[in-house]
């Protein structure tokens, strides 16, 4: 088979399609949002895309322009990679629909990333935005209310030795309202393995991995969910 390309050449061709997959995902998500009834309820969160984990993450050099080292408190592990930040519109008894998606270095504060997304494209307006404690910020909350007509709702940050049971109930309720975004991330991982990127060897490869995964998820969400 003298005319077959090498494996490296084939990978390079695939990696060049990253921007096309990003555009495809954007179009499909926008079509799904246009077809869905507005609920005026939104969620915000992030998930890790891990290029290297554990002891290997300390010496990882892959895609350093995009990736760096940080600790994931939920999983209690260190990883080298990026974060995927998502604003999504809630739907009753269905998966939420992403309104905006952005990647950042793994160590970037979730709040800063959310502020940048809001500044870039104002993905949500007129409603309630449910988020976890990482997004507690009085100034940003006031900005969202004044500029976007969005009420930012987060669990109460408990003070030391605070035992107010009523506030615990409120936080539990807010966590339940945020549950669909966790379900979405679990579904996305099950369908695409987007969080598992140990096979990645370059920035271009990482972008292809992320955007092709999002394009597949958008396609499934558009026609089957």
Question: What is each residue range found by the language model?
Answer:
Residues 1-225:
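Short alpha-helical elements
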């Amino acid at each position: 088979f003298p005319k077959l390309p090498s494996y490296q050449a084939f990978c390079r061709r695939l990696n060049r399609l990253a921007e096309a997959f990003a555009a495809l995902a954007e179009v499909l998500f926008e079509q799904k949002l246009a077809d869905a009834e507005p609920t005026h309820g939104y969620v915000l969160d992030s998930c890790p895309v891990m290029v290297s984990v554990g002891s290997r993450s300390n010496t990882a050099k892959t895609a350093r322009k995009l990736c760096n080292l940080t600790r994931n408190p939920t999983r209690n592990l260190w990883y080298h990679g990026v974060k995927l930040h998502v604003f999504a519109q809630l739907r009753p008894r269905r998966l939420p629909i992403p309104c905006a998606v952005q990647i950042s270095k793994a160590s970037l504060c979730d709040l800063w990333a959310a502020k940048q997304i809001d500044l870039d494209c104002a993905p949500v307006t007129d409603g309630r935005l449910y988020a976890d404690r990482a997004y507690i910020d009085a100034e940003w909350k006031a900005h969202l209310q004044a500029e976007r007509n969005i009420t930012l709702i987060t669990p109460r940050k408990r003070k030391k030795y605070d035992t107010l049971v009523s506030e615990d109930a409120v936080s539990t309720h807010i966590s339940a309202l945020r549950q669909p975004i966790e379900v979405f991330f679990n579904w996305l991982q099950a369908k695409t393995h987007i969080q598992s990127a140990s096979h990645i060897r370059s920035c271009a490869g990482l972008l292809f991995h992320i955007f092709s995964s999002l394009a597949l998820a958008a396609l499934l969400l558009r026609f089957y969910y």
